[in-house]
Amino acid sequence: DNSCTPKPSCFF
């Protein structure tokens, strides 16, 4: 997903 832009939740 590209929704990790507003928050660093893409690392989890």
Curated annotation (Swiss-Prot):
It comes from the Eukaryota. Coiled coil: none annotated. Disulfide bonds join 4-10. GO terms for molecular function: toxin activity. It is found in: Secreted. One of its GO terms (cellular component) is extracellular region. Keywords: Disulfide bond, Neurotoxin, Secreted, Toxin. Expressed by the venom duct. The cysteine framework is C-C. This is Conotoxin Cltx-1. It comes from Californiconus californicus (California cone).
